[in-house]
Curated annotation (Swiss-Prot):
Protein name per UniProt: Sugar fermentation stimulation protein homolog
NCBIfam families, sorted: sfsA
A single MF term (Gene Ontology): DNA binding
Similarity comment: family membership: Belongs to the SfsA family.
Pfam families, A to Z: SfsA (PF03749), SfsA_N (PF17746)
Domain of life, per lineage: Bacteria
Length: 234
């Protein structure tokens, strides 16, 4: 996924109210931009980090700029816009990069499903295969090379796991897809120390037949591309 128009850079002052971020532009202007991330963003929002932001063509937006990437003092790149994860996975499937998810003739997004009234991120269909339900999660929490999900307690994520378990138990293909969007992450685990209920459910999901697929992205100010398969460590 290429950024067009190109991203602009600034220095992070602070993130607050979950969706807002104050930045300082190279000319000294202070600007408030939108932050599309409801997580804790641990290690991603340190004051002084370089912020890379996009500009919307929608003139009606109160905050036309969106925080896309963080560049940390030690050189790590992080995609902080969680809305990009689904787009990246769709792009990678269509490009043939995700070998585990090839051979389907139809791809749809945001399809209603499940007993808890959820929407599946990606639905793959083909007349010769079971339907494939894919829930996408963005991983940005880093601790000594280890990536963790979630970075905060997530009742919504727990609901998604219950839905995936139900899909698997009904004999259809069920996939939890971790998009690793932090250049410093070397492997991924469920964050037992942050959300023990999510950890318990992910173990149940694996036992029920839910597949866990992990791909890491290459990131820079020009583009993001999911291109490196990684293992999930329970």
């Amino acid at each position: 996924m290429k950024f067009d128009p190109p991203l602009q850079s600034a220095t992070l002052i602070k993130r607050y109210k979950r969706f807002l971020t104050d930045i300082e532009l190279p000319d000294g202007e202070i600007r408030t931009i939108h932050c599309a991330n409801t997580g804790a963003m641990t290690g991603c929002a340190e004051p002084g980090n370089t912020v890379w932001f996009s500009t919307s063509e929608n003139k009606k937006r109160k905050y036309p700029n969106s925080w896309e990437l963080a560049e940390t003092a030690n050189g790590h790149w992080i995609c902080v816009n969680t809305a990009q994860a689904n787009r990246l996975v769709v792009e990678a499937i269509n490009a043939g990069t995700i070998t585990e998810l090839q051979g389907y003739s139809s791809l749809r997004t945001e399809v209603k499903y499940g007993s808890e009234n959820s929407r599946i991120d990606i639905l793959l269909e083909d007349k010769n295969k079971p339907v494939c339900y894919i829930e996408v999660k963005s991983v940005t929490l880093l601790d000594n090379g280890q990536g963790f999900f979630p970075d905060a307690v997530t009742t919504r994520g727990q609901k998604h796991l219950r839905e995936l378990i139900e899909v698997a138990q009904n004999g259809q293909r069920s996939v939890l897809f971790f998009a690793i969007l932090h250049s410093g992450i070397e492997n991924v685990s469920a964050a037992h120390h942050i959300d023990p209920d999510y950890y318990r459910l992910i173990k149940q999901a694996e036992q029920a037949g839910v597949e866990i697929i992990c791909y890491k992205a290459t990131l820079n100010q020009d583009e993001i591309k999911l291109n490196h398969c990684m293992n999930f460590n329970q």
